[in-house]
Amino acid sequence: MRASMVRRMAAAASSSASSSLRPAPLALLPPIPLYRRLLRAHRKHLPAEMRLLGDEYLKSEFRAHRNIDNPAHLIGFLTEWQLYAQQVEGESWLGEKIDQAKVEKLSEQQVGQLYELMMAIKSRREGGEGEGQESP
């Protein structure tokens, strides 16, 4: 009886220790199901203007990365898009800033693209607010 209790306690301790020390691995979706999930998330959770911008960006990124040969790049690409899908579906991303560590890893071209995206969002917001103020 004592040995079985020790085994149960050891099993419980090892399972809780392993789960608390490292998160469970994220099961990556294949590219096409992930792409469809992202489009559905945009359709369900984003306003029309943001959806159009998001869908265009999503399509261009998936097209640009269609022929990736490096497995590390593929895993990184799919992981980040899957995390994005979870954020959009959970709506925890609203008003959230980009992690500084991720910004530091961006290339100059990516920083430029991010800046262009920020300016497009700002101009759409200002355009939308201006239209709302003009109508009586």
UniProtKB/Swiss-Prot annotation:
Please give the coiled-coil regions recorded for this protein.
none
Give the GO terms filed under biological process for this record: gluconeogenesis; mitochondrial respiratory chain complex II assembly; succinate metabolic process
Query: Key word Glycosyltransferase present in the record?
Result: no
Q: What is its main location?
A: mitochondrion
The transmembrane residues are none
Q: Which InterPro entries match?
A: SDHAF3/Sdh7 (IPR008381)
**Compartments reported by the entry:** Mitochondrion matrix
Q: What GO cellular component is one of the record's annotations? A: mitochondrial intermembrane space
Q: Where is the transit peptide?
A: 1-24
User: What keywords are assigned to this protein?
Assistant: Chaperone, Gluconeogenesis, Mitochondrion, Transit peptide
The role this protein plays is: Plays an essential role in the assembly of succinate dehydrogenase (SDH), an enzyme complex (also referred to as respiratory complex II) that is a component of both the tricarboxylic acid (TCA) cycle and the mitochondrial electron transport chain, and which couples the oxidation of succinate to fumarate with the reduction of ubiquinone (coenzyme Q) to ubiquinol. Promotes maturation of the iron-sulfur protein subunit of the SDH catalytic dimer, protecting it from the deleterious effects of oxidants. May act together with SDHAF1.
- Subunit details: Interacts with the iron-sulfur protein subunit within the SDH catalytic dimer.
**What protein family is recorded?**
Belongs to the complex I LYR family. SDHAF3 subfamily.
Q: What is this protein called?
A: Succinate dehydrogenase assembly factor 3, mitochondrial
